[in-house]
A protein has these predicted regions:
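Bacterial N-terminal signal peptides that target proteins for export
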Residues: 6-19
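Bacterial N-terminal signal peptides
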Residues: 18-28
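Low-complexity, acidic/polar, glycine-enriched regions of mature
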Residues: 31-191
Length: 191
């Protein structure tokens, strides 16, 4: 009797181990990484100010994207940037932005949480960290694959008050609306 129980336990463990190995193999076979081409990609912020609007574009950022090759569903997205790399085509404004962010070398990041589809539109959710404050944001996005090239586009609405930042004011009457639009266009090779 003892031998039968021992054999059954060994077989159950062996079967479970084999099933886990098979599941890991299947999962890893479908997973892939996306090597982002920064020359073809863009992350941009649009802002409205008193009497005008302006845009800032990140000249550099880090991006690590993994996902399912077949469905193009992301499993991990990690973006990081230095605000010194956010250029608005106005050097004075860029310097003032660094002061507004608290000086030093402020950084930002985004970490993916999940995706879902609603009425034919795919949405992503992630944690955005700016000025030391983390907030969960949701936004629509699209992903297209042409051969090994993957293109991901999306737009997110932000309010800089949510990140503990003060109203941007110049010359006592000019302000920058706290509602910002961040758009991204990421292009990369699926590996």
């Amino acid at each position: 009797m003892f031998v039968q129980v021992l054999l059954r336990n060994i077989m159950n463990r062996t079967t479970r181990t084999a099933a886990c190995c098979l599941l890991a193999l299947i999962t890893s076979a479908a997973a892939g990484t996306l090597a982002i081409d920064k020359g073809k990609s863009q992350i941009k912020v649009d802002a409205k100010a008193t009497g005008h609007s302006f845009a800032g574009t990140l000249s550099d950022f880090t991006a690590k994207v993994t996902g399912d090759d077949a469905t193009m569903a992301p499993t991990a997205v990690d973006l990081g940037w230095k605000f010194a790399d956010l250029k608005t085509a106005d050097e004075k404004r860029d310097k003032e932005m660094m002061k507004w962010l608290g000086g030093g070398n402020p950084e930002g990041s985004f970490k993916f949480i999940k995706i879902w589809t609603d009425k034919g539109q795919t949405y992503a959710q992630g944690t955005l960290k700016i000025h030391g404050v983390s907030k969960t944001i949701d936004f629509p996005y699209t992903a297209k694959k042409d051969g090994k090239t993957v293109t991901i586009d999306g737009t997110a609405a932000l309010d800089y008050y949510d990140f503990g930042l003060p109203l941007i004011r110049a010359m006592a009457v000019m302000t920058v609306n706290p509602k910002l639009t961040v758009s991204f266009h990421l292009v990369g090779e699926a590996n």
